[in-house]
UniProtKB/Swiss-Prot annotation:
Enzyme class: hydrolase
UniProt keywords, alphabetically: Hydrolase, Magnesium, Metal-binding, Nuclease, Plasmid, Toxin-antitoxin system
Pfam families: PIN
HAMAP family: VapC_Nob1
Protein name: Plasmid stability protein StbB
Residues that span the membrane, as ranges: none
EC number: 3.1.-.-
Required co-factors: Mg(2+)
GO molecular function, one term: magnesium ion binding
Annotated PANTHER family: RIBONUCLEASE VAPC2
Organism: Pseudomonas syringae pv. tomato (strain ATCC BAA-871 / DC3000)
Family: Belongs to the PINc/VapC protein family.
Function: Toxic component of a type II toxin-antitoxin (TA) system. An RNase. Involved in plasmid stability.
């Protein structure tokens, strides 16, 4: 199972999406792809922070009416098991002298707690957490 980082799931919505990422997504069995509640929050925040207009409306509609329904029952929450993985990840990162962004640490903890691979462009923090990582930009 693969947990999609925000940069992967948002790539198809870019004005000029990366062809490698689109091909990689198309090659995956949909039922193996998951989102986290952290990614959903980042997507919603990104849209909310955009200038008001047609692009914002279009992205919001696509997210709420198409993307999220496509991932129904495949959105992982940050639960009590994840809190332990998060604490261990932060301690391990600090001991190694690494800084991990808060959202990445939450997503990594969700993946660790559920035994998932992470698909992301920003591989460093997830590899440092000991996760299996796929970079669709290079796949």
């Amino acid at each position: 199972m693969i947990l999609l980082d925000t940069n992967v799931i948002s790539e198809p919505q870019r004005r000029e999406p990366n062809a490698h990422v689109l091909d990689w997504i198309d090659a995956q069995a949909l039922e193996t792809l998951y989102l986290s509640t952290i990614t959903v929050a980042e997507l919603r925040a990104g849209i909310a922070l955009m200038p008001v207009g047609k692009r914002q409306d279009s992205l919001r509609e696509n997210l709420e009416k198409h993307l999220l329904p496509m991932f129904a029952n495949r959105v992982l929450s940050f639960d009590m098991t994840c809190t332990k993985a998060y604490a261990e990840l932060l301690a391990k990162s600090r001991a190694a002298g690494l800084a991990v962004e808060t959202a990445d640490a939450f997503i990594a903890a969700i993946a660790l707690a559920n035994g998932f691979t992470v698909a992301t462009r920003d591989t460093g923090p997830f590899e440092a957490a000991g996760l299996n990582v796929i970079n669709p930009w290079e796949a």
